[in-house]
Amino acid sequence: MSITAAQVNELRKATGAGLMDCKKALTETGGDHEKAIDYLRKKGLAAASKKAGRVASEGAVGSYIHAGGKIGVLVEVNCETDFVARNENFQAFVKDIAMHIAAAAPQYVRREEVTADVVEREKEIYRAKARETGKPENIIEKIIEGQVNKFYADICLLEQQYVKDSDKTVQQFLNETIASIGENISIRRFVRYALGEGLAKKETDFAAEVAAAAGL
């Protein structure tokens, strides 16, 4: 059966699991919302949802500087207690996220931060291209929906493929870390600087350099 975006979003809100995980759960359970929740819980992907409502006001600001000094990242990751903030696994998570940001260059933490005008501009571009194919409007809208989701996956940290394991998203990595540590964890914000960014210069693939330096 066909799984709609509304079904996926509803399941995502209920569980906190990633979009692709929600879609797979609904597909595997024939679109049954409750069974999909059970599916995600059995997979350990909905464990984070029980903790998502708890306040995370402790944490750490992590940093990563590329070996050549060409890229720098600061990221704030919050947890519930100072005890966990000093935990080695939490510290390793913060470091891994900072390294991912350096390599993948996201622009936002989550899709909700992307302004409506930015999304609408992308939709108009996709719509214009899709109409050139001569396909019906209902098909065009489905094409646009898929392209917008890909757009989010390119620019939103939580929806990007995790650079150290491309089989999972950063959101899935976060959910796994929450489940293993037992506290709510939230990636609040980050800044990423690239040497000479915005200036005319010779093209260099800094992201590839970061990945290579990290052995990814």
UniProtKB/Swiss-Prot annotation:
Positions of the UniProt region annotated as Involved in Mg(2+) ion dislocation from EF-Tu: 81-84
Q: Which domain of life is it from?
A: Bacteria
Give a Gene Ontology cellular component term annotated to this protein.
Answer: cytoplasm
Could you tell me which InterPro entries the record lists for this protein? Answer: EF-Ts_dimer_sf (IPR036402), Transl_elong_EFTs/EF1B (IPR001816), Transl_elong_EFTs/EF1B_dimer (IPR014039), Transl_elong_Ts_CS (IPR018101), UBA-like_sf (IPR009060)
In alphabetical order, the GO MF annotations are: translation elongation factor activity
Q: What role does this protein play?
A: Associates with the EF-Tu.GDP complex and induces the exchange of GDP to GTP. It remains bound to the aminoacyl-tRNA.EF-Tu.GTP complex up to the GTP hydrolysis stage on the ribosome.
By its UniProt entry, which NCBIfam families does this protein fall under?
A: tsf (TIGR00116)
What is this protein's name?
A: Elongation factor Ts
Q: Which organism is it from?
A: Geobacter metallireducens (strain ATCC 53774 / DSM 7210 / GS-15)
For this protein's source organism, the top of the classification is: Bacteria, Pseudomonadati, Thermodesulfobacteriota, Desulfuromonadia, Geobacterales
Q: Which gene encodes it?
A: tsf
